[in-house]
Design a protein with these regions (language model features):
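A residue-level signal for beta-strand positions that form part of recognition/binding surfaces
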Residues: 126, 202-203, 246
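NAD(P)-dependent short-chain dehydrogenase/reductase
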Residues: 153-233, 253
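Short, small/polar-rich loop/turn modules that mediate ligand/substrate recognition or access, typified
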Residues: 243
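N-terminal Rossmann-like NAD(P)+-binding domain of SDR-like oxidoreductases, especially those catalyzing
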Residues: 1-171
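Conserved metal-phosphate-binding beta-hairpin within the catalytic cores
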Residues: 249
Length: 254
């Protein structure tokens, strides 16, 4: 049987593909290459270029491969852009995901691992944030992910879809051949490195009134190698008939 990985040509998805292959899994990747890179996909994976909401294409993949589970990385993920273009975020991240889910369910693929985000929480009411923290996103990006979470919960109740929704905090780092290649780059750590290398004039860190020793912000980062392994653990959990879960992914510090 095979694992369908949507967004498998992206930053985190490509790392998960490599780790799945390393465990002897058969991997089928579906990516539209809007933000992903074909070269990032391990040559041992089976690759399809297209949209997750293309029901005909998804059905073709399911007809040609015995899919056991889906790891769903595919999403637009820029908070600022989501404010400027909320329509494409709700369409791609929510509507297209529902189309994907419906085809999977029609074919009895009922194991689903979802890349969610800490952005579903919005402004923290307390820290550290746990999975019981109230959710009220502050951006269309966060809302688009939150809406998928609500759909997953309802699909479990109605259709017995079993899922693990992993709420990432701040992904960073590189794993073997897999790393960041965003254009334009928006992640903090690469921007700091660009400034150190003289590739940009400076880096501005905003905010000086946070409740921290020096007033600046503290962020929780998690390495993509750890994120990838968390997805493999989620897959094993579902294979053992584990219950659906929402899980924060961070290191608990800053």
């Amino acid at each position: 049987m095979a694992i369908l990985v949507t967004g498998g040509a992206g930053y985190i998805g490509s790392a998960a593909v490599k780790d799945l292959l390393g465990k002897g899994e058969t991997v089928v990747v579906l990516d539209n290459l809007v933000y992903g890179h074909r070269a990032a996909v391990d040559a041992s994976a089976i690759f399809y270029e297209g949209e997750i909401g293309d029901e005909t294409l998804v059905q073709k993949i399911l007809d040609e491969h015995e899919i056991e589970a889906c790891m769903h990385f595919s999403a637009y993920a820029y908070v600022g852009e989501s404010v400027e273009k909320p329509n494409i975020y709700y369409e791609n991240n929510f509507v297209q995901t529902l189309k994907l889910l419906n085809v999977l369910l029609k074919n009895n693929v009922v194991k689903f691992i979802f890349s969610s985000t800490c952005a579903t929480y919005g402004e923290p009411q307390y820290v550290p944030i746990d999975e019981k923290h109230p959710q009220f996103p502050s951006s269309p990006y966060g809302w688009s992910k939150f809406m998928v979470e609500r759909a997953l919960s309802d699909y479990d109740t109605a259709y017995d879809l079993k899922y693990v929704a992993l709420r990432y905090f701040n992904a960073c780092g590189a794993a073997d051949a897999c790393g960041e290649d965003h254009d334009p780059e928006t992640h903090l750590i690469p921007l700091i490195l660009f400034a150190a290398q003289g590739k940009r004039d400076s880096i501005a860190i905003f905010g000086d009134d946070y409740p921290t020793p020096d007033g600046t912000a503290i962020r929780d980062y998690i390495h993509i190698a750890d994120l990838s392994q968390a997805h493999l653990l989620a897959l094993e959990h579902l294979r053992k008939n584990g219950a659906s879960e929402f899980v924060n992914l961070g290191n608990g510090g800053g």
